[in-house]
């Protein structure tokens, strides 16, 4: 991402509430038309950052640029951004149409023009004919859509969404995720989306910033965040991960490997080692990257272990396999392909099980 | 989990639930009956203490005075007198004028106070509210006399202004005038305005205000389009709570009003006292009640209209 593409540039922004440092120092760029998520546990500063973009909080230090303009001195009602609030903040004294048309007041439009725009928005959010409904007659999902329409009708440069799906039940949330993504593609507006739900962030986003304790840990595409996390915190926050202690061994400039506690020696191409000989590392492997078998697989990296626990989850099962040299059992996730296909579900009585994996799936992280 | 449900089932088979009595059963089934039971003490007091006297008043208003007793033949004579003789209309008009001004002044003065506590005080809100009601812990009569001291011919304001050299002679319009009555009423009823205003402002979800700002409203537009309409129930409640009792007030005008400040309440009191024309007093009370009801309805209608207009 080059600077000219960036619609939002956050430059060395810090935020303190009294003695509490909510944002340590954050710099990042958000591109035009991107669906960008701020992901992190509660209290990580993601909502504070969003509210600074909206202008509801000042930056203590640093500067935010939107479309090239510094935002420090721009009050929230003059910023080219609009927000969908976590509580939706639908005006209870107005009907649906007046809620959606609320921000159009300053645009010098006739009543007919305003109503036409509202009707277009109602079609877009799939609630045609709802204009005269009162706010208290709406369900959670409908309120959410109206909050969205009320912001989108103003054609902001950036739409900020503060956990907008958090209050919905699971099914509705999944449906709204798909609709939100489709809507974003349709209108082409940059979305900045705050969530603590990693699955939601992975489903929706072009790029995700993983935050923790007021810092940005990694900004990347969902796939790279999952496959190539840069730190243990990111690896542990997104999905499940097995960690093994290891040491880098370089054999001159020809080849290299990682000695691990539990998984034995894993040969890796030199360009992936990126660390000097003897450096301590952590080796991380996702549960679904392991293959289980009852006999030692030919030509693959493998270790033997014993099944200590199993959980059946329908489409897949989780197994916990104890191996020598590793205090905690290794988590393995394996699809249930059905009777006669793949491995029949193992039981603890089966005797030794073999775990195999590909070196490509291995992630090297700094030792902690 | 399964164990406990099984155990529960076994218990209930051994010992079937006790059946309640017929009255209790009836009350259990009917929510309306339970509701009436709950309000029955209040209902009894209302009937004995308000509806009965009101009916007596109503009957009395159709009688006429005869010497020291009543002529009990029903007649509209009193109502016709109230309608035709200008003194009654003038007094009613003055009463509504004085208490109307007092109401508007009270609500306008109390709204910022309630707003401040609701939006800008973050700790010890209740303490602030209690402090605001502190003056009302002393007797009404004492407060009226306090205003007498402040507004009097040689009172705090006049002597203060004279000492400053701002005025040569004491301001005479301060005491024993409509101004005095309005000032005192506005002060006396402030607590009744602050509390409903505070409650309605406090209830407003702060994210609605942020949403309005986010959608392009500056502070003034936001106040007019969100805060004020959403606090309207409090404003209406405050207006009613002040306007209705102050129109009939007779203590304040009697003590501070002077000749120009007498209100309908003083006149009604006279009818039941010195003039000894109870039927006329009853008629005036009924007429006052009808007028207040009419004004309240018009007021409600206008605020509804205004609210629809603003939004």
What do these predicted regions represent?
Chain B
Residues 41-44, 48-51, 130, 134, ...:
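Transmembrane alpha-helices
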Residues 24-28, 76, 144-186, 220, ...:
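Membrane-interfacial helix termini and adjacent extracytoplasmic/periplasmic loops
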Residues 50-86, 150, 154-155, 257-259, ...:
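Short membrane-interfacial helix/loop motifs at transmembrane-helix boundaries
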Residues 3-11, 18-21, 26, 198-209, ...:
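C-terminal transmembrane helix and the adjacent membrane-cytosol boundary/short C-terminal tail
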Residues 29-34, 66, 79-88, 250-300:
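Interhelical loop and adjacent transmembrane-helix boundary motif
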Residues 2-6, 12-56, 126, 130, ...:
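N-terminal signal-anchor/first transmembrane alpha helix
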Residues 86-119:
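Transmembrane alpha-helix signature in integral membrane proteins
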Residues 53, 57-60, 142-144, 189, ...:
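Non-cytoplasmic
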């Amino acid at each position: 991402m080059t600077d000219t593409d960036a619609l939002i540039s956050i430059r060395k922004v810090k935020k303190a509430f009294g003695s509490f440092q909510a944002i340590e120092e954050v710099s990042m760029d958000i591109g035009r038309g991107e669906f960008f998520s701020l992901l992190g546990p509660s209290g990580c500063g993601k909502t504070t950052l969003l509210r600074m973009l909206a202008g509801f909080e000042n930056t203590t230090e640093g500067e935010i640029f939107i479309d090239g303009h510094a935002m420090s001195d721009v009050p929230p009602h003059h910023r080219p951004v609009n927000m969908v609030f976590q509580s939706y903040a639908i005006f209870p004294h107005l009907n649906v149409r007046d809620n959606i048309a609320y921000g159009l007041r300053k645009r010098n439009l006739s009543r007919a023009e305003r109503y036409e725009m509202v009707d277009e928005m109602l079609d877009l959010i799939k609630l045609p004919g709802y204009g005269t409904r009162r706010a208290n007659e709406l369900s959670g999902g409908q309120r959410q859509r109206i909050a969205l329409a009320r912001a989108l009708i103003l054609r902001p440069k950036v739409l900020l969404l503060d956990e907008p799906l958090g209050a919905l039940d699971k099914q509705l949330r999944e449906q709204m995720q798909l609709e939100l993504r489709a809507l974003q593609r349709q209108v082409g507006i940059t979305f900045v989306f705050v969530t603590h739900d990693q699955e939601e962030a992975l489903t929706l986003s072009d790029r995700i910033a993983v935050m923790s304790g007021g810092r940005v840990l990694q900004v990347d595409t969902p796939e790279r965040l999952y496959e190539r996390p840069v730190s243990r915190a990111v690896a542990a926050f997104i999905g499940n991960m097995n960690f093994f202690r290891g040491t880098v061994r370089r054999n001159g400039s020809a080849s290299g490997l990682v000695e691990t506690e539990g998984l034995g020696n894993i040969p890796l191409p030199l360009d992936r080692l990126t660390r000097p000989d003897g450096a301590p590392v952590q080796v991380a492997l996702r549960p679904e990257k392991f293959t289980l078998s009852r006999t030692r697989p030919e030509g693959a990296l493998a270790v033997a272990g014993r099944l200590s626990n199993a959980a059946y989850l329908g489409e897949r099962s989780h197994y916990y396999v104890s191996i020598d040299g590793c205090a905690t059992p290794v988590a393995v996730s394996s699809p249930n392909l059905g009777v006669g296909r793949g491995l029949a579900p193992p039981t603890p009585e089966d005797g030794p099980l073999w775990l195999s994996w590909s070196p490509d799936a291995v992630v090297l992280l700094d030792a902690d | 989990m399964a164990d406990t449900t099984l155990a529960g089932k076994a218990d209930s088979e051994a010992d079937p639930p006790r059946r309640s009595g017929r009255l209790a059963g009836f009350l259990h089934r009917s929510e309306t009956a339970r509701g009436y039971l709950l309000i029955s003490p209040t209902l009894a007091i209302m009937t004995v203490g308000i509806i009965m006297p009101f009916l007596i008043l109503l009957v009395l208003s159709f009688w006429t005075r005869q010497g020291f007793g009543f002529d009990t033949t029903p007649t509209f004579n009193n109502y016709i007198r109230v309608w035709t003789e200008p003194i009654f209309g003038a007094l009613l008009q003055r009463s509504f004028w004085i208490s109307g001004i007092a109401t508007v002044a009270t609500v306008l003065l109390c709204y910022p106070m309630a707003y401040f506590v609701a939006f800008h005080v973050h700790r010890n809100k209740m303490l602030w509210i209690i402090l605001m009601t502190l003056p009302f812990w002393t007797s009404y009569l004492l407060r009226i006399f306090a205003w007498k001291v402040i507004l009097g011919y040689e009172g705090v304001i006049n002597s203060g202004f004279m000492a400053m050299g701002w005025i040569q002679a004491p301001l005479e319009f301060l005491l024993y005038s409509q101004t005095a009555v309005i000032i005192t009423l506005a002060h006396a009823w402030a607590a009744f305005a602050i509390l409903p205003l505070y409650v309605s402002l406090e209830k407003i979800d702060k994210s609605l205000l942020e949403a309005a700002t986010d959608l392009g409203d500056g502070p003034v537009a936001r106040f007019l389009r969100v805060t004020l309409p959403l606090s309207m129930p409090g404003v209406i409640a405050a207006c009613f709570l002040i306007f209705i009792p102050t129109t009939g007030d007779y203590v304040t005008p009697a003590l501070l009003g002077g000749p120009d400040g007498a209100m309908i309440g003083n006149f009604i009191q006279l009818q039941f006292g010195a003039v000894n024309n109870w039927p006329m007093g009853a008629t005036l009370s009924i007429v006052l009640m009808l007028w207040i009801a009419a004004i309240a309805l018009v007021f409600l209608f206008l605020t509804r209209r205004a609210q629809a207009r603003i939004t």
